[in-house]
């Protein structure tokens, strides 16, 4: 197998037994593909499909004037180039977006044309600016106002029709009341529901309910048509001899005979007996078609049609009328030969529509329309036209109602139609079909839907949400445009003057800036970025509300298998509402989640992959990835464990249709990074998945010794590492960039054969962690496409590395690991294992105030020299300065209002002039509890404001850096072109050339060295083809020079132009501080199995327990943390980690002993190829084997894929190979006494993470600070520099101890006794430590509260 550049330097030994048939797909595909489909930038305007921006514009245009004489049509759109690139946007705090220009056509028709003929009078086309559309970066994020944001996908209920019941909760009888709901993509909801009396009602948009027949009548159906649609009928023949029923024997089954049923003289069924299947067979056998029935049998039956006396035209009985003696007498009197009645029974043919029609008071279509109008617009007087229009617009107008393709597909599929397509609006048949299905379900003939089934929930991704937002903006524009087109002079206007695009821009801006689903990207580490982009949320607009979501919605559903991770979800109020996509999951064209399966044909597993959605999956038998398969791909077992219709079951192998593609198919990316996940309890695995996302990138990254094989994939797809775009040779490397000369076969004509990768150095992330990239390649290295060239934060040689491998012992140690506390060795701190760098951004803004402009300056009143020593002449701190709490970063003075001056100040003013006291110091200082090093300063100046010296220096340095970059780029490109030219001319026959080259001479290396490379292009050969190629090269070089000059000019313009600052801001200075945080007691650490704890103590190395060979352990964990938590994975990880380290040390000893290369090769083969996946060690050269062995000295990295990992036997074999005890336990000695501990201790290497819950960020101290305005009590919380609350229960504690003076101090001078605390401060300054407590402000507040109730209460002073 082929290894990538970094892979072969450190191959990870995998214990996986099964080959993955399918590569893990690109992890950010959901986001990237969705937005690509929205913009369709890669397609020509004519070829664009009906989705995204194009669909939104098409749905709103053409816009017609009210008269229809002027039409504004949409032609096409294009996106311009963004003004700034991603990095510039982040620095300047702007949005990374491109201008949208829409080509529209204004068509004016002739008003005076004859009726019916349309004569075009004028056509104008114009491109209109429609605001900025934010662009997605390569990694699936958006830069909005300078910060990276992610639009989280939403899991919402799919449009379509849903049938449900109330679970017996509505009525006290507990009767199930069924309902149907038609949910469109946009438009009014239509609900049908039963009440406890079995009448059917309709609601529109959840308003007041009306009988369902009102809606049918409004659709134009009369009573007879309604009855005919919903009921079968029985036919009765009436004559003077009696009544005969046209018999359909099947309809009698189960009824109790109300009269004797006879065949000739024989009684088949006696009166009051039940009619059974045997009786029906007898009747069918005798071919009985007509049955004599007594007239009592007819009474109570319901007429299915209007009965009219043909001779007189008189209406005898109405449709849906019950037949009584009176009605029967009238029928006989009029000699009606036959009637039809409704066929109903209590079992499966309920009379629901008939009952509903009785409570319906409307008679005609107009009555029904008016009734609906009254319900929708209560209080407005209805007119015929208004009622008609309102009803039309509700469900039948494409502008107001859209089921969407998904909705129509779900609708048709649910109603059993074969064609998944159809109109976006409702039709009469649709409404009738829904009612019929609802009645069928009430009759017991159908089932209700499960709304938590993933076939009924779909994913709405970025592209779709932005499209909806864009459409909303366009609809607002449409209203304004219609108004304008109706103005008298509209036909003389240009499209630009008619369309005001502000609403569109505003709605897009609002969505990206403040939507619930537009979130500040979680940028702690690469995993948290990837997970954030793969998140699906059920919350947000059009989704669920957190408070109203019940248990069912949050629960794991069988259809989540392979689509949504059952493990990774937040703890707390959002549990189950926010989920993560499974590793292989993707969305289909309709937005439903699909997961891949291998096709199984006649018990044989093929490599054919098919993606199935939850709807399609139900009908198949699907085997697990762990099903045993022989070498020919046949399933071995006769009975295979599989899934079918939401159940786990056993099926014979011939019945199996599909098989899972991978054992990690059911989990998300974060969960798939937990080794031995199969041995952890789900609750702890959930914590493990969530805590990996909080790991802070360490200063020195270290790959996990025990991983799962997913680490490389996550690091690659996260975008934090630099990946080669094209293969080639590394030409130049330094800390900030890598230059690759591209292979000839990968270069395209006109594209430079050089790739330059600028690395990100010490940049701040959203979470204040440090983003830094380090090159992995050396000049001369040959790299292929997609190889990792540089590591980013938390990556080590292209693998995700969130923490550090520590030598752990599971044992108690003096109670310091009580309750999950963690004891660590001082060695961990010394070696900077968990040292992290955090970058803080501090901003100072100079505004224009009413009293005059604020000024950034080093001339600050009443500040000593020492405080200004780190500032330059512009008043801004130097880069590299080490600052501590209280130091000035940026000096700033603000004009002070004219106050009443004291005589002394007047004197000073008279002597020293104005400046002394009319400004106050408002400098930016380092906040308390923070110290660090200034690593960067940026100055932003408003257009028209003079730039200070520092701003100019920064600008010049930036321009110089860009110039150097571009010149290097040009030099490398030229060198590349010259080398290609040299290869073309060497050894060829010359025609003419510089430097006295004779015609017919062969061109040699000496000749080429004697002239400048630029002159090589002047050589003319006798081979005309080569001459043309050389001319092309000369042309390309000229073109590149021109382009680079243009780019330099463009960059210079951007750097020197004024900045677009907020209104009233003259200048803004940003200072970046790098803060180094070592690990210390109070910091939170965790493993990957949900085993978290807080550091209780750091112990000197000499006091730590040590092993027989003198190695002290790094960290001591409490063994009681394992059994009750049921996360045994951590113990297995510890064993395997020890083995991995042991094998690495063994390789190290071999290298030290200068072992032969064959020896090393055979040992590596033993390590890699005895169990698990086979590695191709033989394909590596000797040098590569030595480099690999060198990289393995500190441990052989191992992978145990989830649900397919190392067995106990595998671990023991590895421990044996490393010459370590198979028990995984060792005898330890107490570092303080040297005594042996009583029992052997489990020792090994565990991967530990430092989480972003650092004690430095949580703890602070206050002496005096801000107070609340009303109560005058100190504020609370670190952000407000608040105090500690001494609450009710704490007061009880002091009361219990009788500590009266302490209590008095707490409640007065330390809290809200305003005079007392001022006096106390003064006393302490004077060295007098007495206190006088006065009355706390709380009493005054209480008095005021009581007075507000109208009770006058006064305190009497003694």
Curated annotation (Swiss-Prot):
CDD domains: RNA_pol_B_RPB2. Its EC number is 2.7.7.6. It catalyses: RNA(n) + a ribonucleoside 5'-triphosphate = RNA(n+1) + diphosphate. GO terms for biological process: DNA-templated transcription. GO terms for cellular component: DNA-directed RNA polymerase complex. One of its GO terms (molecular function) is ribonucleoside binding. Keywords: DNA-directed RNA polymerase, Nucleotidyltransferase, Transcription, Transferase. Pfam families: RNA_pol_Rpb2_1, RNA_pol_Rpb2_2, RNA_pol_Rpb2_3, RNA_pol_Rpb2_45, RNA_pol_Rpb2_6, RNA_pol_Rpb2_7. DNA-dependent RNA polymerase catalyzes the transcription of DNA into RNA using the four ribonucleoside triphosphates as substrates. Belongs to the RNA polymerase beta chain family. This is DNA-directed RNA polymerase subunit beta. It comes from Methylococcus capsulatus (strain ATCC 33009 / NCIMB 11132 / Bath).
